């Protein structure tokens, strides 16, 4: 995965929760692309001045109750919500996506995978909307990314789905290497093959695949 280094965003903050395990990978990825990254503990009240906040993957609080439910009520989340509501960029990867739905910053929920199994493999995804700061510099439409989750089955009400589709909020969908979106290329049973979504303003992005794992052979 190659990302053009023309972003003017230079300061990022990765939030660490008990059970996070992709925070260091994200730190490596952000620094590789020129970000001055800061690691922020979940119990801090405020986030340092940032252009981008990242909620990383992992198993925050051991995934007790529901994935992301306890993290969604942690001390730092108010600052994340305030930052997002002011137009700041917030990215949630895997467990971070689950946290964003738990806080209400993104619509829908992430359910247990269709076949009740943990999935760990590479998949292809199609970028559905490039009119945003996350994907506008990526030339490819189809990307190969890694997934590792037990609860990645995206679901929302039919009214929410219509709103999401009408507003161009579907960010990425599961597909094959040619871009075909169908059931056999849907690893977890997600509604409409959805792998990631935006909020209405496109400043918040949640996605189950891990782009940070594809930027360096070591990761």
Locate predicted features.
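N-terminal beta1-alpha1 cap of cysteine-dependent amidohydrolase-like domains
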Residues: 1-93, 99-107, 113-119, 126, ...
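Short, flexible active-site-adjacent loop segments at beta-strand->alpha-helix junctions, enriched
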Residues: 96-97, 131
């Amino acid at each position: 995965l190659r990302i053009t280094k023309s972003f003017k965003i230079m300061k990022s903050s990765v939030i660490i929760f008990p059970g996070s395990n992709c925070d260091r990978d994200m730190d490596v990825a952000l620094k590789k692309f020129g970000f001055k990254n800061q690691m922020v503990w979940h119990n801090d009240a405020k986030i340092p001045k940032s252009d981008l906040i990242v909620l990383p993957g992992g198993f925050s609080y051991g995934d007790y109750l529901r994935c992301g439910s306890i993290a969604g009520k942690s001390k730092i989340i108010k600052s994340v919500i305030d930052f997002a509501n002011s137009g700041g960029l917030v990215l949630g990867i895997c467990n971070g996506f689950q946290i964003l739905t738990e806080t209400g910053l993104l619509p829908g929920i992430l359910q247990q995978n269709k076949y009740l199994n943990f999935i760990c493999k590479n998949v292809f995804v199609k970028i559905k909307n490039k009119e945003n700061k996350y994907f506008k510099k990526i030339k490819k439409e189809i990307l190969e990314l890694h997934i590792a989750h037990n609860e990645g089955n995206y679901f929302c009400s039919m009214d929410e789905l219509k709103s999401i589709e009408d507003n161009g909020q579907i960010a990425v969908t599961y597909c094959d290497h040619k871009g075909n979106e169908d059931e056999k290329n849907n690893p977890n049973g997600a509604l409409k093959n959805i792998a990631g979504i935006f909020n209405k303003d496109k400043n918040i992005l949640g996605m189950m695949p891990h782009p940070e794992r594809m930027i360096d052979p070591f990761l």
